[in-house]
């Protein structure tokens, strides 16, 4: 089966972005999942690994997970495909963490972080800033200039750290 070149390129781009530490961590996890040591993770091995992590996927869910990253279409996950899968999962976790952090800042739940909410959070985190400093921080991320931080502005701020 021919591999779509754009899918192959996308996977190569993701792998190039990995740090040496991420590659080491992923390789360690891959070797734990690859029970028979043949260099691939089968549906059976993925199922065992997921159950050991407290998940209980159906056979169909396992097949779907493999198919999402199975670049060469052989029904198994090789290390580069595993890296793509792990990086994708990390991105999803990051966005969940950003969403949760936004909820913490947005005390009244109205979808924006006011200067007052931002200041309240900073004080409760033990950070002492003057009114001017808080206003300056908000100005830096307040793209639309409304004096508040909306979700998109917050995501941009958190992503630029």
Curated annotation (Swiss-Prot):
Ca(2+) 2 binds at residues 70, 72, 74, 76, 81. Residues 21-56, 57-92, 93-128, 129-161 form the EF-hand domain. Keywords: Calcium, Metal-binding, Repeat. InterPro entries: CALM/Myosin/TropC-like (IPR050230), EF-hand-dom_pair (IPR011992), EF_Hand_1_Ca_BS (IPR018247), EF_hand_dom (IPR002048). SUPFAM superfamilies: EF-hand. One of its GO terms (cellular component) is centrosome. One of its GO terms (molecular function) is calcium ion binding. CDD domains: EFh. Ca(2+) 3 binds at residues 106, 108, 110, 117. Ca(2+) 1 binds at residues 34, 36, 38, 40, 45. It holds the Pfam family EF-hand_7. It comes from the Eukaryota. The keyword Metal-binding applies. Ca(2+) 4 binds at residues 142, 144, 146, 148, 153. This protein resembles calmodulin in sequence but possibly resembles troponin C in function. PANTHER family: CALMODULIN LIKE 3, MYOSIN LIGHT CHAIN 1, 3. Belongs to the calmodulin family. This is Calmodulin-like protein. It comes from Caenorhabditis elegans.
């Amino acid at each position: 089966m021919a591999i779509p070149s754009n899918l192959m390129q996308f996977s190569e781009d993701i792998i190039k972005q990995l740090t040496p530490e991420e590659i080491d961590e992923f390789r360690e996890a891959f070797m734990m999942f690859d029970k028979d040591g043949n260099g691939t993770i089968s549906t059976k091995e993925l199922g065992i690994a997921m159950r050991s992590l407290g998940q209980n996927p159906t056979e169909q869910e396992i097949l779907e997970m493999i198919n999402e990253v199975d670049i060469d279409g052989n029904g198994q996950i090789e290390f580069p495909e595993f890296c793509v899968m792990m990086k994708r999962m990390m991105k999803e976790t990051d966005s969940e963490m950003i969403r949760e952090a936004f909820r913490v800042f947005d005390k009244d739940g109205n979808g924006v972080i006011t200067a007052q909410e931002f200041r309240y959070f900073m004080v409760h985190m033990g950070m002492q800033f003057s009114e001017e400093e808080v206003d300056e921080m908000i100005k830096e991320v307040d793209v639309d200039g409304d004096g508040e931080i909306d979700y998109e502005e917050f995501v941009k701020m958190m992503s630029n750290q």
